[in-house]
Amino acid sequence: MRDSVFNCCVSPPHPPGAAAAERRSRSPAPQNHSRFLMFFDFDETLVDECSDDSMVSAAPGGVLPGWLKDTYRPGRYNEYMQRVLAYLSEQGVTPAAIRATVEKLPPCPGIPALMHFLLSQPSRDFEVVCVSDANTVFIETWLQHMGFQPLFLRIFTNPAHFDDNGVLQLRPFHSHECLRCPANMCKAVVVRQYVAQRIRERGGRPYQKVLYMGDGANDFCPSLTLSPGDVAFPRRDFPMHKLIQEMGEAKPGEFKASVVPWKSGEDVVNTLRKILERT
């Protein structure tokens, strides 16, 4: 990785201002006695590909025209994706077809086992949250299809809805000052503020551990908010993992959390079992 993000998100950006982007699952109101708080990314962490990329398969011939691809600008991916979604609608791709495409997204290896493990645990053990640069329609559609939505107490992502013309409309989650993250979301802000909010709601009682599972460079940002005793689960050999390794070589001891790389959700299950045995 040539472009280091070691200094990203060291000062608090603007607070999230998109309350509509936070979706409560069908699970009960938050319990204040869970011992562990676990965050999940969505693309290439829960699902084994980028959900936005899967939309290409819905286009005529399974490809996007060159003129459309040429409109992409670095740091403005969501704006580009909005043009893609408008194009799909113009080509007759319906909301039902988009949802069906999302439902076909395969889970990452071992993710069903990890989700079922967490669902089987008492509420006093794990509070589970999703933080993703995807959107509400994609994430909620997939979680509902797989039967995993009751596990997630909160979903923080870009708001989305189908308008009267059947076009999926996207909005940015929030604004921020992090120069390294996409303009629409800095996950470190979300994690930092959510943890602080929940600790206040718990009467000042912290979690025993905060856990973060992800894969991308934008998952490295929130992992920097973790403390000693917390655990980062980077997908092995993906950008998050490589950036953690890079930091370890350039600034030994700077990354505070324990690091457990994963290839399968089963790797995470094994670590969670050990944590439960020790606490």
Swiss-Prot record:
This is Probable phosphatase phospho1. InterPro entries: HAD-like_sf, HAD_hydro_PyrdxlP_Pase-like, HAD_sf, Pase_PHOSPHO-typ. The active site is at D41, D43. It is found in: Extracellular vesicle. It catalyses: phosphoethanolamine + H2O = ethanolamine + phosphate; phosphocholine + H2O = choline + phosphate. The keyword Transport does not apply. SUPFAM superfamilies: HAD-like. The gene is phospho1. Transmembrane segments: none annotated. Mg(2+) binds at D41, D43, D215. Keywords: Hydrolase, Magnesium, Metal-binding, Mineral balance. Phosphatase that has a high activity toward phosphoethanolamine (PEA) and phosphocholine (PCho). Involved in the generation of inorganic phosphate for bone mineralization.
